[in-house]
Amino acid sequence: MLSKNEWDPLNTVIVGIADNAMRPPITNSLRTVNYANIIDTGAIEVGHYPAQVIEEANQDLEILCDFFRKENIKVLRPESNNPQYYNYCPRDTVLIHDNLILATPTALAERRSEWTSFQKHLDQVTIAPTPNNATLYNIDCIRNSNILALNEIDPCFDAANIIRANDDLYYLVSNTGNKKGAEYLRSLGKTVHTIENVYSYIHIDSTIAFLREGLMLLNPKRITNVKEQLPESLHNWDIIWAPDPIDIGYYPNICNASVWININLLSINPNLVVLEEHQHNLRIELEKYGIESAMLPMRHARTLGGCFHCVTLDLIRNHI
């Protein structure tokens, strides 16, 4: 059965690659989604990421793959090609949920064909309608953090705006997911709970992680009042408040993620997660709930914009 939550025993996983990762020339989509807070975009470097970043990221991804294989988890990889953006984060472009494999209508136009690099591993893909770029982006968001990048005309969202808890999908409204996107998922028969006014920048998986049924890890800098900020269906869940993360830094002048990569962990099963190797304060908190941590490197998580949840796509979990 396809994966339908974040915690059941992992059976088959797609792991990204860093080959030929790009910082594309700045378009309206990149300007509004990625760079709205930047005044002078002329200082933004474009082109391939430095060779050191690519090499070290691929080394760490191989270490992750070796760990999966030792856990008897089947590993699948994208094809190496020349992407418009990268193939590092398969989580961002495809939603797996129960009977659905959905290629999502991503916020960055440059990423909408990214999923085809691992298409050979997917059966019966539903391809969401492509948004109209001419009307999608709200340029008023530039230098105004109170305005989101996406207009509410066409459905538009990254798959990583969503986390799964069996029949329920939790959907972050942000620069990479509009309310129309949640409506589209409901039209496919999904139960969708929107989360708003929590984190505007990009994805949900540096703010909330589901560890097992009824237990979640929360970012205390973004979630300050559970009953006001989260859907009622989560109000009775037990909470682990993430301790301050250890900042692993980033390649000079290239930062694509906040320090909160500790929350961007991956559950192997309800009692084991993969955690960035420096986050021992979180490891200690997880142990209090009977959750062990495999401490692995991901040196360029902040540079490339993704730690273990982002760089993987759990295709099959053995549901308990």
Language-model-detected regions and their locations in the chain:
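The feature marks the mature, well-folded catalytic cores of soluble enzymes
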Residues: 1-320
